[in-house]
């Protein structure tokens, strides 16, 4: 279809399987967050009108830093990028079903509306600004919206005379 001018063409019923659609408006792009979650995620449920998602990842950071994610804690990325053009930007990563997560995988919960599908969708990973580490998959059904809020920062004690 290189250089084809399809202006006002009626393509309904056309079989384009095998056609090279790269750099056309018909090119298959990145999946929506919902599509990604349905294909690569572990599940979803509605909590307080939002879609809570279940995913998995490695317990220890594999590429940036040396973070080890502990069960029961909420983690918030110090920086988060919504850029969808590159696969490696600031954020916390979620692995798809086919993505290797090492010998100690963990289940995590995160909000679907905060998720970014980016870069090469074949990587089967996405990023989120925060997630909660679960002890087991069954914990997902008991989570509330408050469970995804980070713990308040400890305040310094006031000096007393």
Name what the model sees in each region:
Residues 27-89:
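ADP-ribose/NAD+-binding catalytic cleft of ART/PARP-like enzymes
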Residues 57-58, 133, 156:
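Positively charged, low-complexity intrinsically disordered regions
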Residues 80-139:
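ADP-ribosyltransferase catalytic core
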Residues 153-161:
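Long, low-complexity, intrinsically disordered segments
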């Amino acid at each position: 279809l290189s250089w084809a001018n399809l202006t006002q063409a009626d393509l309904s019923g056309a079989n384009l399987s095998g056609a090279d659609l790269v750099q056309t408006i018909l090119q298959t792009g990145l999946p929506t967050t919902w599509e990604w979650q349905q294909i690569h995620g572990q599940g979803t449920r509605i909590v307080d009108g939002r879609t809570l998602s279940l995913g998995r990842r490695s317990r220890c950071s594999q590429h940036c830093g040396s973070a080890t994610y502990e069960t029961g804690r909420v983690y918030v990325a110090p920086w988060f990028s919504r850029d969808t053009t590159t696969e490696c930007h600031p954020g916390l990563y979620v692995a798809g079903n086919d993505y290797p997560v090492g010998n100690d995988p963990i289940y995590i919960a995160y909000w679907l509306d905060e998720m970014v599908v980016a870069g090469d969708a074949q990587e089967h990973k996405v990023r989120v600004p925060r997630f909660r580490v679960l002890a087991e998959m069954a914990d997902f059904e008991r989570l509330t919206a408050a469970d995804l809020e980070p713990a308040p920062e400890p305040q310094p004690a006031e000096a007393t005379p």
